Amino acid sequence: MKYWKKYTREKLTKRIDEALESTIDFQSSKYLGYPVSKLDENVFNTNGKILSESPLLKSYIANPNNIGCHTLGKSEEAFKGSQELEKEVIQVLAVDIFKAEENEYDGYIATGGTEANMQALWIYRNLFKKKYHATLEEMVILSSEDTHYSVHKGSNILNVENVSIPVDFDSREINIEALDAIIKKLIKEGKKYFMVISNMATTMFGSVDNPDIYAEILTKHNVPFKIHVDGAFGGFIYPISNRQSTINFENPNVSSITIDAHKMLQAPYGTGVFLCRKGLIENVLTKEAQYVDGMDLTMVGSRSGANAIAVWMILFSYGYYGWFEKISTLLLRTEWFCAQLNDLNIAYYRNPFMNIVTIKSEFIPENIAYKFGLVPETHEGDNKWYKVIMMSHVEIDDLSKFVEELRTHTN
């Protein structure tokens, strides 16, 4: 790893203190033009002793605004400290995890995977409009039926049709013949420009799509397309556990990627990440935001600099090898759990590089599912699956109690 290092507690604190020192202190400064201030001292303790012992809490009190996309260069000078740490986060994720070339990427910390996925669709819609003078009716989004519901939100907001591709019930793999037939039909109906959401660990199954399947068929039909990888859940696991993965920026078919720090990285909510190749994010430049230094190319505008510092702090507390050890532990627990299910002849789906196990509902009584907090595929109608996720708090002791309940039920 070129940039992803493990820092001591002292170095982490020093870097964060330096970042905050180079960010305007609205407690003491008299800047008149910013609609910004520190947190309200009548409500929040802005001078407590605990702040000196917690650089992250100090960041939240300082309340920096990371508006803009800092990989492009110019940004709001008032918040340059927290922006610099965000740039380091994007650098680690783009270069070290997703194998982008130096300075050939852009990105920012979004509010979550939903925003990051919608950012990608927004970029590609505008790109097709600018480059090909495409109409909304000529564009279409392709995504598997297991894709996160954010694609439907994006489709609705951007007014671009989304078409779901069927997957095999047991393997959760995209039905290639159906994909080919659907693309043929869409072209015949007048669709000319295709946006793809390809999954790196679906929310329900942890299943991973092969983006090259989409690329091969779309290339065969000679239509322009862009592929976005939704790695909201899998982005901090799959590239670590599967070192042979080609779902990264070395793959020319991949144009952008979503990752969520507030899932596996256990960062505060509001810490999704959007990454893309250079030359794409400019398609959503908001020219009217002229009072923002460096302009704005993000969907939400103002963003928490403290959240960016939180993600930076977690990444550099672990370093690559510390994170590898953590993921390896979770995968060992997952393998142990799967072995118990095999002994009980319980049918389930699991991608071998992921920590999600999704069990067919016929093997799980509703009272057991409720007792252990299993998540169903649907709360409405005929549910066919329940999922178990080996997060950090889910230990083998917890899993063994669940297994014993299942054993009693099956006997």
Question: What function would you assign to each model-found segment?
Answer:
Residues 365-372, 401-407:
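Short amphipathic alpha-helices in soluble, non-transmembrane regions
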